[in-house]
A protein has these predicted regions:
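Residue-level signature of outer-membrane beta-barrel architecture
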Residues: 42, 79-81, 91, 133-135, ...
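Bacterial N-terminal signal peptides
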Residues: 10-22
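Residues on the lipid-exposed face of transmembrane beta-strands in outer-membrane beta-barrel proteins
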Residues: 38, 73-79, 129-133, 164
């Protein structure tokens, strides 16, 4: 069962206050100087009981009916601290419980968000913190649209971009429209962890 604990409520409130403060700063600056986005996702799943003639082993999915849930909330905050430079920070809060109470029993878990969760107590952590520097090299201009972890602006078609810090492999090397974000795309975590990478932890 999903419970809104006092600790979770406090974390969400602090996150909201921080975002509002950043929005006040954004109003005082140009449109492409600050970027603020947020996302909250709640995923609840269940399975009915099923026959298990051999009996459930230590690493098996229990045959009795079960349910699981995840809750995550993320702020996508960005700013332009200097010319052609960008700074991004993504604080995130997560909680959840998998089937059987641990991550066993399925070859590919049906909710990729469970990789972030650490039990019924919400955890606040730094999901991303990175800088991006662009060196324009001519060749005409093109417009970059504003979005989560992306400031709007005009850049040269020929450019060198350096990204450094804490971010996900999937942010750069697997930008597909189907299986890189369990919040909005296919949820099975095999699609973007061990089924796609030798070392699955690189995808977080």
């Amino acid at each position: 069962m999903f419970l809104i604990t006092s600790r979770l409520a406090s974390l969400v409130l602090c996150l909201a206050v921080g975002m509002l403060a950043c929005m006040q700063v954004a109003r005082a600056q140009s449109d492409d100087a600050v970027s603020i986005h947020g996302q909250v996702t709640y995923n609840w799943q269940k399975h009915d009981s099923f026959s298990d003639p051999r009996g459930a082993g230590t690493n098996s999915l229990t045959s009795s009916a079960g349910k699981m849930y995840t809750f995550t909330g993320t702020a996508f905050l960005g700013m332009r601290p200097w010319v052609d430079g960008e700074l991004y920070f993504n604080p995130e809060v997560a909680q959840g419980v998998p089937f059987t109470g641990n991550l066993v029993g399925l070859g590919g878990f049906t909710n990729g968000e469970i990789t972030r969760a650490a039990g019924t107590s919400p955890s606040l952590y730094r999901q991303r913190l990175f800088v991006r520097q662009t060196w324009n090299r001519g060749g005409g201009k093109e417009t970059i649209e504003e979005g989560a972890n992306q400031l709007s602006g005009s850049v040269d078609r020929n450019r060198v971009v350096l990204t450094a810090g804490n971010f996900s492999t999937l942010d750069v090397f697997d930008n597909n429209a189907y299986a890189k974000d369990p919040r909005t795309q296919f949820m099975n975590w095999g699609s973007w962890t061990y089924a796609a990478y030798d070392y699955a932890a690189d995808s977080r």
